[in-house]
UniProtKB/Swiss-Prot annotation:
Belongs to the NAD-dependent DNA ligase family. LigA subfamily. It comes from the Bacteria. One of its GO terms (cellular component) is cytosol. It holds the Pfam family HHH_2. PROSITE patterns: BRCT (PS50172), DNA_LIGASE_N1 (PS01055), DNA_LIGASE_N2 (PS01056). GO terms for molecular function: DNA binding; DNA ligase (NAD+) activity; metal ion binding. This is DNA ligase. It catalyses: NAD(+) + (deoxyribonucleotide)n-3'-hydroxyl + 5'-phospho-(deoxyribonucleotide)m = (deoxyribonucleotide)n+m + AMP + beta-nicotinamide D-nucleotide. Keywords: DNA damage, DNA repair, DNA replication, Ligase, Magnesium, Manganese, Metal-binding, NAD, Zinc. DNA ligase that catalyzes the formation of phosphodiester linkages between 5'-phosphoryl and 3'-hydroxyl groups in double-stranded DNA using NAD as a coenzyme and as the energy source for the reaction. It is essential for DNA replication and repair of damaged DNA. Its cofactor is Mg(2+); Mn(2+). InterPro entries: BRCT_dom (IPR001357), BRCT_dom_sf (IPR036420), DisA/LigA_HHH (IPR041663), DNA_ligase (IPR001679), DNA_ligase_AS (IPR018239), DNA_ligase_CS (IPR033136), DNAligase_adenylation (IPR013839), DNAligase_N (IPR013840).
Amino acid sequence: MQAIQTEIAQLTAELNQHNYRYYVDDSPSIPDSEYDRLLNRLKALETEHPQFCLADSPTQRVGGEALAKFEQIQHLKPMLSLDNVFDEQEFTAFNQRITDKTGSISYCCEPKLDGLAVSITYRDGVFERAATRGDGQTGENITENVRTIKSIPLRLRGDNFPLLVEVRGEVIMPHKAFDALNERARAKGEKLFVNPRNAAAGSLRQLDSKITASRALGFYAYALGVVEPESWELADSHYGQLEQLRSWGVPVSQEVKVCDSVAQVIEYYNDIQQRRSSLEFEIDGVVIKVNQIAHQLSLGFVAKAPRWATAFKFPAQEEMTLLEGVDFQVGRTGAVTPVARLKPVFVGGVTVSNATLHNADEIARLGVKVGDTIIIRRAGDVIPQIVAVVAEKRPDDAKEISFPARCPVCDSEVERVEGEAVARCTGGLFCEAQRKEAIKHFASRKALDIDGMGDKVVEQLIDKELVQSPADLFKLTASAMTMLERMGMKSATKLVAAIDVAKQTTFARFLYALGIREVGEATAANLAAYFKTLDALKAANEETFIKVDDVGTIVAAHLAHFLAQPHNLEVIDKLIEAGVHWPAIEEVAEEDLSLKGQTWVLTGTLTQLNRNDAKAKLQLLGAKVAGSVSKNTDCLVAGAAAGSKLAKAQELGVKVIDEEALIAILS
């Protein structure tokens, strides 16, 4: 038996070494047939002696039992997006902003992979979990699917790595794998994937990991995330950290390069763009990062992106097609947007059949008519956009595009405020289109966060005339909800209960939920902190609004206009009458800010306090409420089923209290 255990260990190590040579070094050392022979021998031994199977065995990539749904995972550190530049002038301006603060620097450049961003965590060198980026704070647990990707090591190489390592990178589908996948689908008469990115995303989000295992996905790391202990010595440059990842067996693109000047970055960009079609994977630009970690730390971040990095996007791909007609859509704030119906055309990796014309000014600028041949571009390889008319191809029967004087949905008057490009329906919540979008926004996760109130549910509620305004949501009964498709009494009762829970919110969330133009989460929070009460907000004028942080003349005008409309005030009053409420925001004297300067973290389920209430009350006492535990955390509040944050706090020696202790502090 000892000999069998030894052979299994040797085969596992040998196959993992071959995987490293193949996927990381790009220098396979044995033929595929020999690899298959070794793998089959290992499978046979493990089948007979499963007790000797190792966690990093390549046989563990075949996939396991199908999941019912993906669990949500909170990232140890936010996964931010990148700002973009689209030409040399914009990149030069980006470089100037950096060097004005840091002096001379170098950049680490790499292809911008067009796949799905993921976070992979290793503990003691062993693959522990993986998650999608999601909204940057929370992603989906795709551990079992990522485990099937052959290029991702299940155990890090060597022994010189931290206790905990978070690897961030992109899951991609190589062109060869994409073509083979579509060939199989075509042979079976199944729907084809449009591009490798969609194929990678669809494959990674399969509830059955065996399907993911069959899709030949790849992975390239582009950064380190959280590392514990924090004192562990990492390389002092981004390139050096990528080399550390490579030494641990993690795949890193061979195209990564350090550039010491703007000219070298431009040269690198042009070279990658020229070779774009010959690369084995899809890319849509180049990512440029300040190489020195010390400079990255000093430059910091804006709300959702680092100041020290940017994506230098390739010029959008363009094609010609026919403009067959124009539809007019109405959005949440009443904006009437012309949408061009196009003869379907394949551009930038997708088939495009619609494109926005933005507004009447854009139609006039283009001089476009129905029947024209137009040039379509995917701006930033994302948003289809009409950029020009091919005038010489205009037919004799081309028709002018007439902007409607009345709303195409509710027949209310369409008005255009002087100085604004957008025309808007004046129907407000009387307009079904605005009503649907307004209520979807009201129920969304960052607003009142009504669990289970998805877009399709909202649309049915309005179509069946069960809801006319946000306040009507709080009058719904379970029996009425059963009128909706696929809504039994059990689901209806659960949804009504979720609506009732949502009545307890915060002033900031309530303001955001109202859907006031240009008032996002941050502005809503600033308004709540400044005015503290709804009555004070209602009584304010434009001059007062401008005194609030981040509120300029435009937002102030939108606020004043919103609060001057009787039907908006009626909606607000009805919401309050329906029981929507939030904890009072009281003026706190400086000496009463007992938690000023402290950083607190909440984890687990709070049974007596709403999490938003707890966060708001801690902030009123001067505390900063963070989303993750670090050595700078002063206190962790651990509710029921506390997980990794609690373990990390205990490891770092951070003070931990329960909900009862929190209530005592807040009272």
